[in-house]
């Protein structure tokens, strides 16, 4: 089965979408924020504004198809990233100062992890398609590669960070971004 957006249409490989939370309440879509000592907005967070779709995100699979099959590995990147960011692509960074590995904008260190995420359907009822976002990789060299939920962690500054977590999985839907580039 292929990924389907909130309107019941097939998610296009390389297309641009908003990732909007499907469980309310709890904030809006995904965006980049300056967190901690960052000089540039590099940390991926859920918007605190429930009415915000967040920033448009390009979703791509290495498969040569027009659609994205469910459970296939994908890369995610902001369609219009901050100019100061090293890359538009989402990656997982384990920082000693943070409790959980966070999703940030950055370069991949390993070509195997060029497509480190996947979506797993949670439920589909009355045209409501919702998916968990998972990170498929290892956080250190000794650890075996496996898929783990991406959850939300509210930090001391009040940001709702996207983190690799066993608790509070993020459940999203795909909302097509209106743009001349999609």
From Swiss-Prot:
CDD domains: beta-trefoil_STI_WCI3-like (cd23362). The modification Pyrrolidone carboxylic acid is found at residue 1. The keyword Disulfide bond applies. InterPro entries: Kunitz_inhibitor_STI-like_sf, Prot_inh_Kunz-lg. Disulfide bonds join 40-84, 136-147. It comes from the Eukaryota. One of its GO terms (molecular function) is serine-type endopeptidase inhibitor activity. Keywords: Disulfide bond, Protease inhibitor, Pyrrolidone carboxylic acid, Serine protease inhibitor. The record marks 64-65 as: Reactive bond for trypsin. Belongs to the protease inhibitor I3 (leguminous Kunitz-type inhibitor) family. This is Trypsin inhibitor 2.
